[in-house]
Amino acid sequence: DPFMQALEQGLPAGVWTLAQVSQGRLDPEYRHHFYQATGWQEEVGLILPVRDGLTLMLFLGRLDKRSTLSRDELARLEGVFPLVHSLCRQQWQQSQPLLAQSTAQPDSTSLKSAVEQAMASVGGDRLTRRERQVAELLLQGLDTEAIAAALGIGNGTVKNHRKHLYGKLRLGSRAELFNLFLNHLITAPVGDIQTP
């Protein structure tokens, strides 16, 4: 991974394109296989050191076949970078991670299945079918309007389902829902996640 290699060589915090970190030395075979597997046409990485020994890397990929990122697009990313970096440092300031230890090491095919099962079963029988659907779409990053459109319900109904599921699961935010989901995924042995 060119980003990881660059980070190991001292890549500083910031917004970096693949071309910048590879400095024109990217293996064409790696590029072909990576982009064919992901469907991405271009990649940009946000390098976010959050504390000693912990650096987050957030990758954004372009799926359409337009030209490379424009200077304006990169400038906008660089403009929001300080805020994103600050929020990440605030979120990950703890010295100990909050994620549980995995009980299994799934291969790539079973990992996809495990993620799908975990999404469909997060919250267990505490949630209604519709609340589980809303939770699954929240975990996929959809906003209220997109969830409403996907489920054929109103925005207010989505907000009510979100409020109820957060209350039932004692959550206060999407970040807490995501943390709950990750722990659910990590601690359930592959194939043992029960979908209500």
UniProtKB/Swiss-Prot annotation:
Domain HTH luxR-type: 120-185
Keywords associated with the record: DNA-binding, Transcription, Transcription regulation
Pfam short name (any one): GerE
Protein species of origin: Aeromonas salmonicida
InterPro entries linked to this entry: Sig_transdc_resp-reg_C-effctor, Tscrpt_reg_LuxR_C, WH-like_DNA-bd_sf
GO biological process: regulation of DNA-templated transcription
A GO MF label: DNA binding
Protein name: Putative HTH-type transcriptional regulator in exeN 3'region
DNA-binding region per UniProt: 144-163
